[in-house]
Amino acid sequence: MNQIAYCNRIIFLLIFIFSIPLEAKLLKPTKSSKEKEILMVNGKRRLYYPISDEGTHYAVQGPTRIEFISRYPVIKNHKKSHPFKYLIVIDGEDTVSVRHRYKVQRSISSIQHPKHRYTYSGNYFINLEKGSHTIELLTDDNQKYPVLMRVLAKEFESMGKDKKVLKPMVHKNSLDLISDGKSIKYFECAPGLPLQIEATGKKTLRILTRLQFSDSMGQEDSYRIRVSEGTKVLGTYYFNTERSPSSQIEERMDRVPGKWRSCEVDVPKGKHRFNIEVLDKDKVVLTRFILY
């Protein structure tokens, strides 16, 4: 089993063309569920499960979006940032390696382990297609402490008509992407050149993405984007896509757009500025932003 490959079956697959997640449901492990950690986060009790040496297992019914919220326990008053990682195995076949590095969040505490402190949360998202699925989380033997995990599942609903297309604050000219005879404007996002989007909430920001395929690339490929606000990383999103047979980039006939993949970001009340960046070197992603 390839432990570093991006998995084809956990692509950000939109079951409905315009959909958003409903309220999240906390998933409980089907095995190794006796061990748990209760953390106080912003005055609220939050239940986490440590990833066991034998692996932590979940049973999930799709279509749904899964959010993995992970934290790492550290020695009290340790100020430096701490790397940690874990593996996600979907349906016993596809595996993704997730890596985070965060500083200690001083406001987090534990009743069971008062001498420990905990990092800021690392958030990782996947979408699962319709049907029954299994998820297994595996830890790294070299880590001193087990990664604490909180797994949430969110269903989908229609986005509705109240939506607005946003443009990046600073950008090059938009590109016209022709799909099924319709022209849609996208904005290029490349490594080292993040886009900034200003949005006012309380709303949801949908980010539509298409990987730009060159002649040297294969029929399928993977890419990652990271969404942040200031220094806070809101989420890292992993996509797998393939060349679109029904779309083309009008200004770049020597390039082929991939099939679109998307993710959603919650926009709290007030004005916010989000950074969207591509994490894979030498890959260009075409983006479109919808606020609703």
Per-segment meaning from a language model:
Residues 90-153, 229-291:
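Beta-strand-rich ligand-recognition modules
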Residues 39, 88-89, 177, 227:
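Short aromatic-centered micro-motifs
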Residues 2-11:
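Bacterial N-terminal signal peptides that target proteins for export
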Residues 55-64, 125-131, 194-203, 264-270, ...:
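Extracellular and analogous surface-interaction loops
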Residues 24-63, 73-78, 99, 105, ...:
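Glycan-recognition and processing domains
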Residues 78-86, 217-225:
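Short coil-to-beta strand junction motifs in C2/discoidin
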Residues 11-19:
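Bacterial N-terminal signal peptides
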